[in-house]
Amino acid sequence: MARFHNPAERPYKLPDLCTTLDTTLQDITIACVYCRRPLQQTEVYEFAFSDLYVVYRDGEPLAACQSCIKFYAKIRELRYYSDSVYATTLENITNTKLYNLLIRCMCCLKPLCPAEKLRHLNSKRRFHKIAGSYTGQCRRCWTTKREDRRLTRRETQV
């Protein structure tokens, strides 16, 4: 992997890094900033799709694997949780329509699409302010957590 010593020349998004290195998302090899193991191809796509930033340590570009993203997202939630608000309240607080707000998933840090934001609104679920940014749950994490709760409930019933 090439090293970027000049901060002005560093690409901070994974597709831009691929363009700079003249490679593709399929062929890029990049390590996790937390555990230092190379990302699998599915994790590379997830990182690019999540629109997260590439970070640099000693000029070397690093990303984050899915297990580390979920682990550190939970730590971030536990350390920096501030409050929870409904979608209409969030629009009033920010004076911005829900559609125009950048809201990430609190579990996997993927930006929520308009349908996922609307799902929060219709099912009266709250958005949570964590580390100064509002978060919700994407479709995948919403259903995964729901399945986990259902399994736990069955295990505890006698």
Curated annotation (Swiss-Prot):
Give the free-text miscellaneous remark of the entry: Belongs to the high risk human alphapapillomavirus family. The cancer-causing human papillomavirus E6 protein has a unique carboxy terminal PDZ domain containing substrate.
User: Subunit arrangement?
Assistant: Forms homodimers. Interacts with ubiquitin-protein ligase UBE3A/E6-AP and thus forms a complex with human TP53. Interacts with human NFX1 and MAGI3. Interacts with human IRF3; this interaction inhibits the establishment of antiviral state. Interacts with human TYK2; this interaction inhibits JAK-STAT activation by interferon alpha. Interacts with host DLG1; this interaction leads to the proteasomal degradation of DLG1.
Entry protein name: Protein E6
- Protein family according to the UniProt entry: Belongs to the papillomaviridae E6 protein family.
Tell me the gene name: E6
According to its record, what are the GO cellular component terms?
A: host cell cytoplasm; host cell nucleus
What's this protein's function? This protein may be involved in the oncogenic potential of this virus (cervical neoplasia-associated virus). Plays a major role in the induction and maintenance of cellular transformation. Acts mainly as an oncoprotein by stimulating the destruction of many host cell key regulatory proteins. E6 associates with host UBE3A/E6-AP ubiquitin-protein ligase, and inactivates tumor suppressors TP53 and TP73 by targeting them to the 26S proteasome for degradation. In turn, DNA damage and chromosomal instabilities increase and lead to cell proliferation and cancer development.
Q: Where are the zinc fingers (unnamed)?
A: 32-68, 105-141
Matching Gene3D superfamilies: E6 early regulatory protein
